[in-house]
């Protein structure tokens, strides 16, 4: 052993080992000093900040800035659904990672209509796993088109995935959902029926306009002769009617405030609304058909998924306050840009117990087994939906957009812009897109008999080593400095003026938690 040691060219190394064995505390000190140096100055060091409870610094890491415009390799229709999807006119748009594949199967099992899904692929193993899982779900094989987006060293590219799924949807009408949401059975049929009546409404309105134009041309001379005689009488009537309408609206709104709508006392609320109607008060909630084309005909007589009649079927909606339509529909845009709001909830109960009709849903809510989505985390994110009003509604109603509203929407994809692909990771991806829709003139109409429920799960980190806060405030910086002002400029608004109570560029209140 001694000869081997003395003759070995690496004997200096052995001697070093001998010395280390004799004085291990010296080596330990060296390792500690190296670790401290790397922790403070190296890649493991956490970027310190002097932020307060509300403010947060924007990450200056090169990985964040370099990834803003990263390109991704994609493969569209990596799997194409086997079913005949030509007969459908609405698709769900969603995105997910391979470990959430079971959720897309659950979604497809309830939706039973086209789904365009983008899958985030991080390895070849993911591809094998996808095709193995596809074979295990009949609903997926029949209804789901899968498009692959391959990872490229960035945070989770949520908007790249959404755009990939959206561009390759087989229908013009699309419902954007996260993969953890489940719809009730029959919701596709309800939405399809709503769109059918919307098309019929528009066609009838066009025909009526053509007929009216012809009649107007024939009657112009007669009308001109009669106008002078009727002017004085009309002026008197208009003044009287306007005064009556204003008085009725004020009285009804005051009585609504007196009702103090309680979402946990649905039966009492319904009785109070019925009492108002029996007293002959004028209600200011119009049905969707009148909102869109001025027709007096009803659109949705509370279309139920299972033909179960709720207590409030075919009743005018007394609402719970909120946004009222003017009698002349002056609130409504004339560009036919409509987005339908699907109220969203969350629950930890088994998905097999999720309700498929509104009456059962309300029972679960009263038992606190199903809750409004994000009500404790971000009340402003879904506040304009006005859940208290929705519980009682049997007809669609218009809501007023306000930043930071982020409902799940059914829209015509030909009318919207892409989701901003600079936003990667967690935060403000849907909020900012909805802001752009509002700036472009969209109306947001809540449907009374459609909803989705989030299947609660243990939170997992988003792609990337950065924290939730870092990802969220990095995204918020892009939203404040670029996305919001750009959306206003594109639609003819002053980028430096508030439009929907949104934060302004270079404002101290932008990078704070005050938004939500």
From Swiss-Prot:
Listed under GO biological process in this entry are: calcium-independent cell-cell adhesion via plasma membrane cell-adhesion molecules; protein O-linked mannosylation; sorocarp development
Q: Which Pfam families match?
A: Glyco_transf_49
Where along the chain is composition biased (Low complexity)?
A: 202-246
Record's bilayer topology term:
Single-pass type II membrane protein
Task: List, alphabetically, the GO terms of the cellular component aspect.
Answer: membrane
Instruction: Please classify the protein's predominant subcellular localization into one broad category.
Output: membrane
Give the Extracellular compartment stretches of this protein: 46-516
Q: Which residues are glycosylated?
A: 152, 386, 412
Highest taxon above the source species: Eukaryota
- What keywords does the record list, in alphabetical order? Glycoprotein, Membrane, Signal-anchor, Transmembrane, Transmembrane helix
Q: Where in the cell is it found?
A: Membrane
Asked whether the UniProt record includes NADP among its keywords, one would answer no
Output the Gene Ontology terms for molecular function: glucuronosyltransferase activity; xylosyltransferase activity
* Knockout mutant characteristics: Slow growth, aberrant morphology and development. Produces a severe defect in spore formation. Cells are more adhesive. Alterations in glycosylation on membrane proteins and decreased gp130 and gp150 levels are observed.
Q: Where are the transmembrane segments?
A: 25-45
Topology Cytoplasmic: residue spans: 1-24
Q: Which stretches does the entry tag as region Disordered?
A: 199-250
User: Which family, according to UniProt?
Assistant: Belongs to the glycosyltransferase 8 family. Highly divergent.
Task: Give the protein's function.
Answer: May have a role in modulating cell adhesion and glycosylation. Essential for development.
Official protein name in the record: Glycosyltransferase-like protein gnt15
Q: Which organism is it from?
A: Dictyostelium discoideum
Q: Which gene encodes it?
A: gnt15
């Amino acid at each position: 052993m001694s000869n081997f040691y003395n003759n070995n060219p690496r004997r200096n190394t052995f001697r070093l080992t001998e010395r280390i064995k004799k004085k291990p505390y010296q080596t330990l000190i060296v390792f500690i000093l190296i670790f401290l140096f790397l922790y403070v100055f190296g890649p493991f060091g956490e970027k310190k900040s002097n932020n307060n409870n509300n403010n947060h610094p924007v990450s200056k890491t090169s990985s964040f800035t370099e990834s803003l415009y990263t390109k991704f390799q994609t493969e569209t229709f990596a799997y194409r659904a086997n079913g005949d999807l030509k007969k459908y006119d609405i698709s769900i748009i969603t995105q997910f990672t391979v470990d959430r594949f079971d959720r897309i199967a659950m979604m497809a099992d309830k939706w039973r209509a086209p789904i365009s899904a983008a899958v985030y692929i991080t390895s070849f193993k993911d591809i094998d796993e996808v095709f193995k899982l596809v074979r295990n779900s009949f609903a997926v094989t029949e209804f789901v088109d899968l498009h692959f987006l391959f990872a490229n060293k960035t945070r989770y590219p949520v908007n790249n995935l959404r755009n990939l799924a959206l561009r390759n949807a087989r229908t013009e009408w699309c419902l954007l959902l996260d993969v953890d949401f489940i719809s009730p059975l029959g919701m596709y049929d309800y939405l399809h029926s709503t769109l059918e009546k919307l098309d019929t409404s528009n066609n009838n309105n066009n025909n009526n306009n053509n007929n009216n134009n012809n009649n107007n041309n024939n009657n112009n001379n007669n009308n001109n002769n009669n106008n002078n005689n009727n002017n004085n009488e009309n002026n008197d009537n208009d003044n009287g009617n306007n005064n009556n309408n204003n008085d009725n609206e004020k009285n009804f709104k005051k009585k609504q405030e007196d009702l103090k709508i309680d979402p946990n006392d649905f039966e009492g609320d319904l009785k109070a609304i019925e009492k108002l109607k029996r007293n002959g008060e004028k209600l200011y909630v119009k049905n969707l058909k009148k909102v869109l084309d001025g027709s007096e005909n009803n659109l949705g007589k509370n279309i139920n998924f299972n033909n179960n009649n709720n207590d409030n079927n075919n009743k005018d909606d007394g609402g719970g306050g909120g946004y009222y339509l003017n009698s002349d529909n002056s609130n409504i845009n004339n560009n036919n840009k409509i987005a339908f709001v699907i109220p969203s909830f969350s629950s930890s109960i088994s998905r097999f117990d999720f309700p498929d009709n509104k009456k059962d849903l309300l029972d679960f809510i009263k038992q606190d087994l199903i809750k409004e989505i994000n009500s404790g985390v971000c009340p402003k994110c879904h506040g304009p939906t006005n859940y208290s009003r929705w519980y009682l509604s049997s007809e669609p109603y218009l809501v007023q957009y306000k930043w930071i509203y982020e409902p799940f929407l059914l829209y015509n994809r030909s009318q919207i812009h892409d989701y901003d692909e600079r936003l990667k990771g967690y935060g403000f991806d849907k909020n900012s897109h909805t802001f752009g829709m509002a700036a472009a003139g969209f109306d947001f109409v809540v449907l009374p008999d459609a909803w989705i429920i989030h299947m609660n799960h243990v939170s997992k980190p988003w792609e990337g080593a950065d924290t939730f806060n870092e990802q969220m405030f990095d995204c918020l910086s892009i939203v404040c400095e670029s996305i919001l002002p750009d959306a206003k400029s594109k639609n003819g608004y002053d980028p430096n003026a508030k439009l929907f109570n949104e934060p302004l560029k270079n404002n101290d209140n932008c990078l704070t938690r005050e938004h939500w």
